[in-house]
């Protein structure tokens, strides 16, 4: 048995002293993990977060310019001309409009605007407005300077409140043709006094009719006289209306009372983001590509979870916390020490922390020492594929779907609920698609990395042929001496197998001879052991028979 052990040690020593080259991959101290279709929290050397999660908490300019911030005024207050609103905003361009939640200057005289949400959307979608006079004061032969205490003793700056003059209110008949070449937004109203007395004091009669007509509309109005709850100290109301007069169209108004007549209209120009933000955020000295009600953000990432109401050049919103794409390898640290005397091992044993210049590479040992080098070609091809994956994800998710925080009246509550549900479901679909796409790409990336290592291993295996033997750990033990220059030819694919064939053949025969001698000795010892064991068993059986016959426990009768 001592002979067998000695031969085995000599054989191991013979193989261990061979020059060796291993194929491996990078390992780092990264704590990054990604999810795949089949695994969660897979450790990887590198990962790219695809989801932008931060904002600056400010109102910023966008690519279309600065926002229009209405500090104390609402949009309808600006449109109808609340006397407390700043008229200096005329002609100013905006990219989006900001209303403050605490704004108090809306409709000073109590009442409702017909289709208010549509009006706000129309106005905010423009980029600027210009006031234009529709009916000058000389149009009317009644009093046109009606005021209200609710409007700070004044009245709207874009409408005239027509009342009786000298105790009379003759029929007012006026028309205006749009020769501006652009659409004009015009506004009017109908007054509803609280009592018949107030009605007569203002318009001399209780039964009045007002008609407003263009080529597209024909509206007829009558007052609804009666007391209502006090609002702003008034029991009367005004119903507010609006329409758009297109180029070449004519507006005709005919009334014998209760008319709040158009005075100025608005020419709306350009196109903005069409968004109204109701927020107290402060204006910052910043320009962003994407603005939300929470703040602005700049990002090159394909997704964001800041707000689904983001506008501008924005990444697609998905309501998850993180979405990581694997852009590196499985991070598998070395599973064991490198064996006796620091012997090297290949990818079967885990990754290499010392491989920093590439994802895949080689490690070798020879008489000149130990060396490591990255395989730049396979690494670059893998990097190019991953770059293509990122672009592919962006392209696949590039279909625009912009959610707008729609405004609905109280009557349209159910419609608003349905709209929100549809928006939420579409967002859920986008989030699911994004997550699934990334899971698929992560699975594919990690599988490709495994394939890349195997391809590199097989490439070296084909190059070495019978000049080397695999050790089962991702390495090749060479049958010939291979200095650093020789190792470089293996790495770069210029290895000359024929040059080392004869030396390899002799070394292989030498090693195989030792193996055969070992095997022959083992067979002799096996036969010897078998024979010796059989003799021991036979002698033991004979001794048992002798003992049994001597004490009479066993008797042998021979019959002839």
Question: What is each PLM-predicted segment?
Answer:
Residues 2-560:
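Extracellular/luminal domains of secretory-pathway glycoproteins
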């Amino acid at each position: 048995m001592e002979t067998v052990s000695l031969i085995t040690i000599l054989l191991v020593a013979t193989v261990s002293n061979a020059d060796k080259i291993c194929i491996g991959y990078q390992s780092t101290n990264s704590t990054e993990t990604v999810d795949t279709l089949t695994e969660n929290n897979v450790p990887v050397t590198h990962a790219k977060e695809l989801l932008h999660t931060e904002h600056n908490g400010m109102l910023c300019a966008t690519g279309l310019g600065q926002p229009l911030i209405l500090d104390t005024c609402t949009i309808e207050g600006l449109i109808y001309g609340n006397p407390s609103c700043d008229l200096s905003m005329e002609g100013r361009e905006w990219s989006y409009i900001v209303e403050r939640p605490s704004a108090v200057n809306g409709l000073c005289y109590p009442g409702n605007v017909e289709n208010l949400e549509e009006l706000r959307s129309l106005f905010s979608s423009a980029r600027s407005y210009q006031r234009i006079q529709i009916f000058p004061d000389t149009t009317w032969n009644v009093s046109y300077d009606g005021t209200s205490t609710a409007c700070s003793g004044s009245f709207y700056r874009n409408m005239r409140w027509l009342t009786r003059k000298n105790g009379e209110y003759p029929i007012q008949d006026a028309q205006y043709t749009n020769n501006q070449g652009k659409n004009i937004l015009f506004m009017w109203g109908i007054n509803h006094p609280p009592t018949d007395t107030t009605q007569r004091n203002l318009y001399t009669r209780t039964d009045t009719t007002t008609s407003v007509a263009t080529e597209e509309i024909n509206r007829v109005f009558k007052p609804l006289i009666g007391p209502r709850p006090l609002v702003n100290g008034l029991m009367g109301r005004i119903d507010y209306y609006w329409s758009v007069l297109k180029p070449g169209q004519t507006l005709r108004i005919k009334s014998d009372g209760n008319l709040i007549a158009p005075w100025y209209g608005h020419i709306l120009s350009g196109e903005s983001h069409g968004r109204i933000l109701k927020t107290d955020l402060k204006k910052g000295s910043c320009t962003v590509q994407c603005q939300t009600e929470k703040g602005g953000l700049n990002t090159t990432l394909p997704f964001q979870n800041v707000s689904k109401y983001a506008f501008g050049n924005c990444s697609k919103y998905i309501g998850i916390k993180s979405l990581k794409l694997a852009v590196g390898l499985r991070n598998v640290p070395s599973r064991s020490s490198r064996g006796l005397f620091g012997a090297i091992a290949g990818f079967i044993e885990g990754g290499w922390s010392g491989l920093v210049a590439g994802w895949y590479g080689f490690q070798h040992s020879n008489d000149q020492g130990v060396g490591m080098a990255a395989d730049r070609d396979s690494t670059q091809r893998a990097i190019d594929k991953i770059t293509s994956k990122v672009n592919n994800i962006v392209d696949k998710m590039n279909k625009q779907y912009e959610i707008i925080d729609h405004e609905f009246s109280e009557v349209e509550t159910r419609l608003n609920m349905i709209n929100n549900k549809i928006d939420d479901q579409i967002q859920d679909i986008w989030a699911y698609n994004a997550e699934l796409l990334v899971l698929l790409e992560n699975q594919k990336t990690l599988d490709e990395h495994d394939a890349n290592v195997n391809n590199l291993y097989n490439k070296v295996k084909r190059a070495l042929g019978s000049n080397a033997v695999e050790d089962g750990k991702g390495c090749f033990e060479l049958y010939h001496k291979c200095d650093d220059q020789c190792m470089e030819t293996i790495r770069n694919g210029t290895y000359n197998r024929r040059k080392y064939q004869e030396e390899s053949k002799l070394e292989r025969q030498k090693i195989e001879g030792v193996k055969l001698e070992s095997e022959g000795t083992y067979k002799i010892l096996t036969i010897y052991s078998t024979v010796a064991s059989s003799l021991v068993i036979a002698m033991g059986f004979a001794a048992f028979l002798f003992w049994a016959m001597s004490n009479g426990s066993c008797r042998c009768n021979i019959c002839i």
